[in-house]
C-alpha cells in the first residue's frame, strides 16, 4: 500500500514507523531537519522499552517531491489542528479516485476541514488514541499501548473500499474499530483530550498526578461534563456513560502521560488550545451553554500560546 504521512511530529513518525515495518511504501512530509536526520540513520521507534530501527521510509520537505509517485492509497494527516486546511490544499494533487484521507488530530473539526477541500467521499472521521512523543527529529517513543483508531465515514457519499485500509492498519499492530456514529466517537475523544489535557496544562502535571489527586480528577470529570452538555445541545447523542467511559480511559493511561497540547505549552510551542478548550467555548457559546472550567483553562493558557506564535518568541 502507498502511504503518505503529512507531518513528522510524534504521531506522524509513529504511524510512519509501524506501517513501514509492516511492509508498506511510506513517504513522510516533514521539516528540513527531519530530512537531514533521516539521511543519517533509520527511524528509531521505541515501544515498551524495545528499540526498533525502521528503514525504507522516503522523507521529503516539499510535497512536490512526492507528487511524482502514483496517487496514494492512504494519506495520513498528522499535522496540528490549525494546519489542517493548508494540508488539505497541499495533498490534493495526490488524492486519486480511491484514496482514503485519515486525519489524526484532536478535536472535532479536522475531517470537515479536509472534506471542504477534498470532498467527503475521500475523508474518514477518526478518533486516534496513542501517546507518541518525538524525542529527536528522526526518533519517536510510544508510551503505553499501540495506537487504537475508531474510524467512520463523515457522510453517505464516502465511496472508497475500507477493507484493505483496515487490514493494512491492523497488520501494523494498530487496533481499528469501525464506528457506528463517527460524530459521537469524535465528541467522546474531544471530551477526553480537552479535559485531561486542559487540566494537565493548568496544573502542569502528568496523568500520574492528576488521576491520583482527588481534586484534579474531579476537575477533569467536571470538565468532561461541560463537553457533554455542549455536545448534547448540538444534537450529539452523548450521555453520562460516555463521561464514565472516558474517565476510565484517562485512569488507564501511563502515569507519565501528558497531552501534546500540554507539552507544547510547556515547551513554548504553538498549541491546539484554540481547537480544544477554545472549541468547547465556541461551541458552547453558540448554543448558550456555560463552560467555566474550559474558560479557566483557555484564559490561563492563552498568553503562552500567543507568545509561542510570535516569531521572536517561538522556541526553535
Over which residues does each language-model region extend?
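Internal alpha-helical scaffold of NAD(P)-dependent oxidoreductase catalytic cores
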Residues: 37, 93-94, 117-124, 137-241
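Short, well-ordered alpha-helices that flank and scaffold nucleotide-derived cofactor binding pockets
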Residues: 17, 21, 89-93, 116, ...
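Rossmann-like NAD(P)(H) cofactor-binding subdomain of soluble oxidoreductases
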Residues: 52-139
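NAD(P)+-binding Rossmann beta1-loop-alpha1 motif at the extreme N-terminus of oxidoreductases
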Residues: 1-52
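Residues at the C-termini of beta-strands that transition into short coil/loop
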Residues: 30, 49, 61-64, 105, ...
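NAD(P)-dependent Rossmann-like dehydrogenase/reductase catalytic/cofactor-binding core
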Residues: 221-316
Amino acid at each position: 500500500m502507498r502511504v503518505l504521512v503529512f507531518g513528522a511530529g510524534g504521531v506522524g513518525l509513529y504511524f510512519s514507523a509501524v506501517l513501514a515495518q509492516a511492509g508498506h511504501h511510506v513517504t513522510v512530509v516533514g521539516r528540513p531537519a527531519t530530512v537531514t536526520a533521516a539521511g543519517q540513520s533509520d527511524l528509531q521507534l521505541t515501544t515498551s522499552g524495545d528499540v526498533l530501527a525502521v528503514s525504507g521510509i522516503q522523507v521529503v520537505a516539499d510535497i512536490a517531491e512526492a507528487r511524482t509517485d502514483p496517487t496514494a492509497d492512504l494519506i495520513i494527516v498528522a499535522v496540528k489542528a490549525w494546519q489542517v486546511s493548508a494540508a488539505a490544499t497541499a495533498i490534493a494533487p495526490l488524492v486519486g479516485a480511491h484514496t482514503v484521507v485519515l486525519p489524526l488530530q484532536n478535536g472535532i473539526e479536522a475531517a470537515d476541514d479536509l472534506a471542504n477541500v477534498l470532498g467527503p467521499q475521500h475523508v474518514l472521521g477518526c478518533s486516534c488514541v496513542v501517546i507518541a512523543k518525538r524525542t529527536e527529529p528522526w526518533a519517536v517513543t510510544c508510551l503505553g499501548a499501540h495506537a487504537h483508531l475508531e474510524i467512520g465515514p463523515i457522510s453517505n457519499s464516502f465511496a472508497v473500499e475500507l477493507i484493505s485500509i483496515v487490514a493494512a492498519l491492523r497488520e501494523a499492530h494498530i487496533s481499528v474499530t469501525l464506528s457506528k456514529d463517527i460524530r459521537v466517537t469524535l465528541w467522546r475523544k474531544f471530551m477526553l483530550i480537552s479535559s485531561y489535557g486542559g487540566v494537565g496544562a493548568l496544573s502542569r502535571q502528568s496523568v500520574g498526578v492528576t488521576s491520583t489527586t482527588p481534586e484534579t480528577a474531579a476537575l477533569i470529570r467536571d470538565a468532561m461534563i461541560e463537553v457533554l452538555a455542549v455536545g448534547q445541545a448540538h444534537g450529539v447523542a452523548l450521555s453520562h456513560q460516555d463521561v464514565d467511559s472516558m474517565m476510565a480511559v484517562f485512569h488507564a493511561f501511563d502515569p507519565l502521560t501528558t497531552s501534546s497540547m500540554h507539552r507544547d505549552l510547556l515547551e513554548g510551542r504553538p498549541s491546539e488550545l484554540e481547537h480544544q478548550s477554545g472549541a468547547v467555548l465556541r461551541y458552547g457559546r453558540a448554543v448558550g451553554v456555560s463552560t467555566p472550567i474550559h474558560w479557566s483553562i483557555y484564559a490561563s493558557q492563552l498568553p503562552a500560546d500567543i507568545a509561542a506564535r510570535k516569531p521572536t518568541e517561538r522556541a526553535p
